[in-house]
């Protein structure tokens, strides 16, 4: 029997120090920020990350970079959108995120480090008892967000004037592969698009490389676009 145990003991000795305890849940801050700033949420003790979206020609179209504290607060967040020629860079300062260049107060926070208000746009956010942002509102629109039991964003519904835009996501049943998902977009209950994503994962159950297929069904014939997402993630 001891000979049968030997390979197991060797495996433990060789790998035990490198074993990673996988966190399957998403923090309220990570889930809510990913909703608002349009990036894939990550799990575990993330220190910093860069998420890059590339088109079929390998050209970068969007990039999101963030640094987080050990408590899971975003210390900084940078969003580059080359398709729309925009760049937003935010840094944490007490109860606000300031513009990294002008130091103007851009986003007011609530609780530990959760979104509360975007004064320049007249947008305010509401949270549930667990700290997840579940509603955003302004004079022009209302948005409601949905999450599963692990805090994974399941979509949102936006109402503005006489239009209702709803995005509903269905993640993989494998809790490790949460970022493998399909999603459907409805405009006034009419289907106008769908999305499918599949990824490779690291040992924290976070996506490293993903293929994202976006189909615009609002035009005839439908237009399909294929993107690649590259994630670079450092952990505490």
Curated annotation (Swiss-Prot):
GO terms for cellular component: plasma membrane. It is a lipid-anchor. A lipid is attached at residue 17 (S-diacylglycerol cysteine). Pfam families: UPF0257 (PF06788). Keywords: Cell membrane, Lipoprotein, Membrane, Palmitate, Signal. Disulfide bonds: none annotated. It is found in: Cell membrane. PROSITE patterns: PROKAR_LIPOPROTEIN. HAMAP family: UPF0257. This is UPF0257 lipoprotein YnfC.
């Amino acid at each position: 029997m001891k000979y049968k145990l030997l390979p197991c003991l060797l495996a433990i000795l060789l790998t035990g120090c490198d074993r990673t305890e996988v966190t399957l849940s998403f923090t309220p801050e990570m889930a809510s920020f990913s909703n608002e700033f349009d990036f894939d949420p990550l799990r575990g003790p993330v220190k910093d990350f860069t998420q890059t979206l590339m088109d079929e020609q390998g050209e970068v179209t969007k990039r999101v970079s963030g640094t987080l504290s050990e408590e899971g607060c975003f210390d900084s967040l940078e969003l580059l959108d080359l398709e729309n020629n925009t760049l937003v860079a935010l840094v944490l300062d007490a109860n606000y995120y300031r513009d990294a260049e002008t130091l103007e107060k851009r986003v007011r926070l609530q609780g530990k480090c959760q979104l509360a208000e975007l004064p320049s746009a007249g947008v305010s956010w509401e949270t549930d008892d667990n700290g997840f942002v579940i509603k955003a509102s302004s004079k022009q629109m209302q948005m409601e967000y949905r999450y599963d039991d692990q805090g994974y964003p399941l979509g949102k519904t936006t109402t503005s004037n006489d239009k209702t835009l709803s995005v509903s996501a269905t993640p993989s049943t494998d809790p490790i592969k949460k970022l493998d998902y399909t999603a459907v977009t409805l405009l006034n209950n009419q289907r106008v698009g769908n999305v499918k994503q599949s990824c490779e994962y690291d040992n924290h159950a976070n996506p490293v490389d993903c293929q994202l297929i976006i189909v615009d069904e609002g035009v005839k014939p439908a237009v399909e676009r294929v993107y690649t997402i590259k994630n670079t993630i450092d952990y505490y």
